[in-house]
Amino acid sequence: MAASLRHMAHFQKALLVARSAPRISTIVRATSTLNDGASKVPDHSMHFKLERLWAVGMLPILPASYFIHGPVMDAVLTVALTLHIHWGIHGVVYDYARPYVIGEAAAKAAHVGVYLITGLLLGALLHFNTNDVGITKAFELVFSL
């Protein structure tokens, strides 16, 4: 019993010394929050809404282009399709061709490639509209087969 009391006194003394000693690890209050990284990323919600509104706005253009032919409808359909395709490809590249996945140089090349494809598509459709029957007349010819 005497040994256990001696051990208890030794334990209490060690506990008091431990409480009065400086801490090895102290709590450091940081001024940052978990949302600091999120504030650096641009907000794409407005782009997403605009893309959806654009897709809904294209719904009446597609059937109307079957019945209305002319350079104005060709230009409207060309711009609408080009923007819609550009935003779709851009979204895929933005989501899947990130620098930490495929590398910095490949990610930049992928983003440049999106604009290159968009420019080529717009140029090809405008060339087709001016030097051939036009995109609306071409749709009518395809559907008449």
Curated annotation (Swiss-Prot):
List the GO cellular component terms: mitochondrial inner membrane; respiratory chain complex II (succinate dehydrogenase)
Report the principal subcellular site: mitochondrion
Q: Which UniProt keywords apply?
A: Electron transport, Heme, Iron, Membrane, Metal-binding, Mitochondrion, Mitochondrion inner membrane, Transit peptide, Transmembrane, Transmembrane helix, Transport, Tricarboxylic acid cycle
Q: Locate the transmembrane regions by residue number.
A: 46-67, 75-95, 109-129
MF terms in GO = heme binding; metal ion binding; ubiquinone binding
Mitochondrial matrix topological domain: 1-45, 96-108
Stated membrane topology is:
Multi-pass membrane protein
The segments annotated as topological domain Mitochondrial intermembrane are 68-74, 130-145
The family this protein is said to belong to: Belongs to the CybS family.
The subunit field of the Swiss-Prot or TrEMBL record says:
Forms part of complex II containing four subunits: a flavoprotein (FP), an iron-sulfur protein (IP) and a cytochrome b composed of a large and a small subunit.
**What's the name of the protein?**
Putative succinate dehydrogenase [ubiquinone] cytochrome b small subunit, mitochondrial
Q: Which organism is it from?
A: Caenorhabditis elegans
